[in-house]
């Protein structure tokens, strides 16, 4: 199994896009990218806009090769929309290049809030136009040659009862590596993502970490991340909300200590790519101070990502 990070906060954008290739199938997880319309009272800096365009170009390149594309849920950084967006770096036509002719494993509209159900409806109509094979993934399993792909039951996007609803995670096994992809579980804060990972016996875990800036129970999140370490994957990739905080390493320091004792490498998308971390959103105030630029106001609203 080969895998490579595509876009994520350590690479300068909001995303968890990740590419996995086995002997049998090529999967593009959550082919989306977006930028926070406002952070610290500021719109995205031009460097963020440039990075979003670069990530979008890489998504389009990898989508050409992919057999399967996932949509774990309908926040804007996890799918390619059918409408133009500066902050999602798309012209309203790029979704065709991402989804045309693909098998699309997508979250069912159950357990979603109104805005996500609305996006699900729009994306479903767009997928019909592309000839994609759209399948509700929740709890499903698929076999491609010797590669098995399993989707989790619906998992909470953050704490149980969260208004943002639920997501689906995925596990890919090719007989050698076993990779678990847990987007936007925000910790995890609940036990279900851990149970799904435990059943998969992962060698690699990619997990959306806790948003320290939202005041969630960080101690609980670290405890649950420790349970993922105890599964003894060779690599634990921390991603997404956690890396919107410049002090994220200090805030989860006990996890690094445990992982070192257990022989588990704690990685980021940037480190997997052999690149330095560039937390552009977390540095937005600094970027405007060091590289003054006219704010690009697009009129794109403040919705949850």
From Swiss-Prot:
It holds the Pfam family Lactamase_B_3. It comes from the Archaea. Belongs to the UPF0282 family. HAMAP family: UPF0282. This is UPF0282 protein Pisl_0021. It comes from Pyrobaculum islandicum (strain DSM 4184 / JCM 9189 / GEO3).
């Amino acid at each position: 199994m080969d895998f490579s990070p595509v876009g994520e906060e350590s690479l300068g954008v909001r995303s968890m896009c990740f590419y996995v290739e086995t002997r049998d199938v090529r999967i593009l997880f959550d082919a989306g990218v977006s930028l926070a319309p406002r952070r610290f009272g500021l719109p995205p800096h031009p460097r963020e806009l440039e990075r979003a365009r670069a990530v979008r170009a890489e998504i389009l390149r990898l989508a050409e090769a992919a057999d399967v594309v996932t949509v774990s849920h309908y926040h804007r950084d996890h799918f390619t929309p059918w409408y133009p967006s500066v902050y999602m770096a798309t012209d309203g036509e790029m979704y065709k290049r991402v989804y045309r002719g693909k098998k699309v494993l997508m979250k069912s509209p159950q357990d979603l809030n109104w805005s996500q159900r609305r996006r699900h409806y729009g994306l479903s109509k767009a997928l019909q136009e592309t000839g994609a094979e759209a399948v509700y993934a929740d709890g499903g399993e698929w076999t491609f040659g010797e590669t098995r792909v399993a989707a989790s039951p619906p998992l909470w996007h953050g704490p149980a009862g969260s208004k943002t609803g639920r997501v689906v995670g995925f596990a890919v096994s090719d007989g050698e590596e076993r990779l678990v992809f847990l987007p936007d579980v925000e910790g995890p804060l609940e036990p279900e993502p851990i149970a799904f990972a435990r059943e998969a016996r992962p060698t690699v875990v990619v997990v959306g970490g806790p948003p320290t800036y939202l005041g969630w129970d960080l101690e609980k999140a670290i405890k649950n991340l420790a349970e993922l370490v105890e599964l003894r994957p060779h690599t634990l990739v921390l991603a997404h909300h956690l890396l919107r905080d410049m002090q994220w390493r200090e805030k989860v320091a006990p996890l690094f200590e445990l992982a070192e004792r257990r022989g588990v490498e704690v990685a980021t998308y940037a480190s997997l790519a052999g690149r330095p971390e560039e937390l552009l959103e977390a540095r937005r105030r600094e970027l405007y101070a060091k590289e003054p630029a006219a704010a690009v106001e697009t009129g794109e609203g403040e919705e949850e990502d």
